[in-house]
Amino acid sequence: MCMVSCSKNEILSLPNYSLQYSVEQVDFDTLFTETGSITRTIKLYNPHKGTLLIDAIELQQSSNSQYIMNINGVSGTIAKNVEIAANDSIYIFIQAFLNQNNVDTLVQYVDSLIISYNSKRESLPIVSWGQDVIKHKGETRESFTITAGKPHVILDSLVILKGHTLTIEAGARLYLHYNANLVIHGSLCVQGTYDNPVLFSSNRIEESYETLPGQWGSIIFRESSTANNFEYAIIRNAVNGLRVYGNAENPISISLTNTRIQNMSANCIFAENAHISASNCVLANANDYVLALQGGTHSFVHSTISNQGAIGGRNYVPSVAISNYSFVNEQECPLLQVVFSNSIIVGKIQNEIDVFTQNDTDILDVEFFNCLVKTTIESKYAHYFNSSIQFDEHENLFRNMYDLNFTLDTLSQAKDNGNFEVAQLVPDDFRGQSRIADTKPDIGAYEFFSE
């Protein structure tokens, strides 16, 4: 221990005077190679009544290191003769810049921060996992296939030409940069499976970005697009999940099966003049509409729509909006038919469904058949609702909707209330479990099973 006569400026050089560290190891999340990481911070604290002189702070692999540090505003792989005054501290900032590893799988990158002082060397491990990627920036492509090997990163846009098809195989991962879009003038064929879904997400893959919406643009379908299919896709954390620009003469066809679209800063699906057929789908949490259908023909069977809003706060508009005109320019969008059956539509506000007409005299072919809904328009538009159930918000519907777990609670209103004939059209739920085995199917994308 330091004696009473010790001065704050005295250099404490005996080995028993030690630093305190804010962490025992520096861990980075999985990182894309050749892309800088976020910064990790280490605090070195001197708890003593005199000054500690650090001979050197260095990265063990020196010039071969995949990391770089910054101390007192100076970047490099080594810093010498660093003083830490009594009861004071310094901060070390570390970033990773990983080289390509030339394999499809993750590779671990390990280094150590070596702190030499008072005739001793102390070590803090630095660990990260690097993933090589295939990058697309401003590309316009004819037909090609994305496989489950290296992830693909879209930095600006990837455009598929009219008459051509982008095929995405099971287990493939597409990561999009801020404001980047996947633009389809031709066709998109997504071939995921339950065990190996296709992922569309942000290229910020650190844990702190996992639920942040608005990190990339959208999957955009242009007028010439046709014959689009999604099977077991996960689309998350964008501005819009699907943005569909069809025309009345040739609506854009999109089939969605066993697909989740969630956590959007604007809309999960915003479609003009489209033909959307969806079954066993989950659309969850958007700050504007979850589902905006302007014109076209649509069918949603055994699907779950839930909206508690995403980070940033939702606007107080209904989750499901149906109209026979464009919300963008108010041009007519002929609405031929919209049918929801054995589906759930709930959310944070009192009215989660609304139907808008261009003229007060317009009558739209809209039906909510045997659905569980949260709405205030049922009395005004009774003809839209056929055998549907009003949601009782005092009951637990899902196991944990705040954790995006939309499997049914033990006492869920949706249990055993599905229409059997409708269930026969989609006999297995999102997980492949039979919903007709007990002849009492549940409403929504998931059949209840005790866990």
Regions found by a protein language model. Give the residues of each.
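Beta-strand/loop edge motif enriched in small/polar residues
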Residues: N9-S13, L19-T30, T35-S37, T41, ...
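Short acidic/proline- and small/hydrophobic-mixed sequence motifs that coincide with surface turns
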Residues: S37-I38, K49-I54
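Contiguous beta-strand segments of beta-sheet-rich domains
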Residues: A56-L59, V107-Y109
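Short, solvent-exposed loop/linker segments at beta-strand-coil boundaries, enriched for Pro/Gly
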Residues: Q60-I78
